[in-house]
Amino acid sequence: MTMKKSECIQRIPEGGYVFRIYPPNNKSQSLGQSTKVYASEKECHDAFDCFIDLLAEHRTTDESFVKIKKHSTQGENGILTQWTFHFYDENGCEVFTRRMPYWAKANCSKGIASVVRYVKELK
């Protein structure tokens, strides 16, 4: 994957940062965007790195078969935000779903490991 971090991380007028993920060779279609506004560029880069590590394992030649959805639920301690990664096979059939807590670095690593294991078994 030849994705440059600088192409995906954008400063927004409010003073924070967001990032977008694009399929290879297609800057007009976004696979996912962080809806959290990061206070610092480093914070945004860290989240991007966590995310891209996961996506990098699941590329076909021209397209990704990963789709990302955001879920927010009201819990006892406030709003909990999670990302769900939906994996599809070449025919567009959903084969696996993985839900991960919002940008917790340790959880991201665990999620990457289990997702990589699963998708390797599919190939």
Per-range role (PLM):
Residues M1-V18, Q33, A39-Q82, R117:
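Short N-terminal "domain-start" leader segments
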Residues L122-K123:
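Short acidic DE-rich linear segments
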Residues V18-P24, S30-K36, A47, Q82-E90, ...:
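A structural feature that tracks compact, well-ordered secondary-structure segments
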Residues C108:
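Beta-rich carbohydrate-recognition and catalytic domains
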